[in-house]
Amino acid sequence: MDKIVIKGGNKLTGEVKVEGAKNAVLPILTASLLASDKPSKLVNVPALSDVETINNVLTTLNADVTYKKDENAVVVDATKTLNEEAPYEYVSKMRASILVMGPLLARLGHAIVALPGGCAIGSRPIEQHIKGFEALGAEIHLENGNIYANAKDGLKGTSIHLDFPSVGATQNIIMAASLAKGKTLIENAAKEPEIVDLANYINEMGGRITGAGTDTITINGVESLHGVEHAIIPDRIEAGTLLIAGAITRGDIFVRGAIKEHMASLVYKLEEMGVELDYQEDGIRVRAEGELQPVDIKTLPHPGFPTDMQSQMMALLLTANGHKVVTETVFENRFMHVAEFKRMNANINVEGRSAKLEGKSQLQGAQVKATDLRAAAALILAGLVADGKTSVTELTHLDRGYVDLHGKLKQLGADIERIND
């Protein structure tokens, strides 16, 4: 069993580079199934276990996938006739596998996708995906743990109003509608930078999508799409995690690839706390010293504070004086890391969807386990400043979303090792 062991107390200094965005590359890999002419080459692809999982799903669908890890590139050739079924064996490992349904419906007019697995955070229902596909003309039914979708007369453009700005549903509907007949309007669409990256990719392939990054997206269906080369945007969640690593240790680091516009709600909160940020063309420099100010945070869909940064921000808030409240509105069950923080002597009380942090916690090293992907990073951040040794287990969560996080922190001066027991 792998574990990461951290001895707290070292100030981080130096420069670190952000990988390509996990939450952009997964939908873009599935969108490569839309290209019936020429392969696509994706660059700046992070070497993550989730990327390998989605590549396996694409392979079962009869796409040829070449993963060039040394180049951080993946080539997807989906020009052959695709299989209609994405089996449970792979889909069960990761929720993002549901994103093959839109491209399969668009290309084949039918699809069978196992109900997804993956992250432990809340129920993450897929009703919005199904609502979108049905609006486009597909008949959907659930049977034996599979979603069966059939659009025997083809997909037809329509207007779809999402009940909630779901990222996955927005992506799936964009992909399905890109080859539908006529115009599709998605209202109350998700606005994340990863949505914009997906739309840009499909447009480069010959698609006609406007409005990505706003709450109304228009997709004019086209006859066919072709493969292209596309660079994945930097990972704003990894960038935010690294900015907090600099701030929590009261260090001075340059995070190359961090883009302010992709993480405005986070950087404004950091500045409110007294963290010094220097925005440069190719990244952000973070510096902090002394006491930080207390702030409250409330997670919201983009451009609000990202739920994927909630646990890391909580780690930083533990090192600030005063009363702080963290409110989680996006996912249920996203305070599972609190029990692990408490093992490190954190002063936190959870009441419903809010966690109350009283005063500056004198964090102590402890044995803790990651409960989900972002909690894994948050526990490592807390370990950077805890007194003594912290040991973090259940690292399969971490490997789903971070490339060599311990190595990057070590390069910046952390006393950190990954050990295989």
Curated annotation (Swiss-Prot):
Pfam family membership, one: EPSP_synthase
Top-rank EC class of the record's enzyme: transferase
Annotated compartments: Cytoplasm
Pathway(s) served: Cell wall biogenesis; peptidoglycan biosynthesis
Modified residues (2-(S-cysteinyl)pyruvic acid O-phosphothioketal): 119
Disulfide bonds: none
Tagged with keyword Iron: no
Enzyme Commission number: 2.5.1.7
Entry keywords, A to Z: Cell cycle, Cell division, Cell shape, Cell wall biogenesis/degradation, Cytoplasm, Peptidoglycan synthesis, Pyruvate, Transferase
GO cellular component annotations of the record: cytoplasm
Main location: cytoplasm
SUPFAM superfamilies linked: EPT/RTPC-like
Residues forming the catalytic site: 119
InterPro entries linked to this entry: Enolpyruvate_Tfrase_dom, Enolpyruvate_Tfrase_sf, MurA_subfamily, RNA3'P_cycl/enolpyr_Trfase_a/b, UDP_GlcNAc_COvinyl_MurA
Enzymatic reactions: phosphoenolpyruvate + UDP-N-acetyl-alpha-D-glucosamine = UDP-N-acetyl-3-O-(1-carboxyvinyl)-alpha-D-glucosamine + phosphate
Role noted for this protein: Cell wall formation. Adds enolpyruvyl to UDP-N-acetylglucosamine.
Entry similarity comment: Belongs to the EPSP synthase family. MurA subfamily.
Name of the protein in its database record: UDP-N-acetylglucosamine 1-carboxyvinyltransferase 1
Source organism: Staphylococcus aureus (strain N315)
Lineage: Bacteria, Bacillati, Bacillota, Bacilli, Bacillales
Gene (name only): murA1
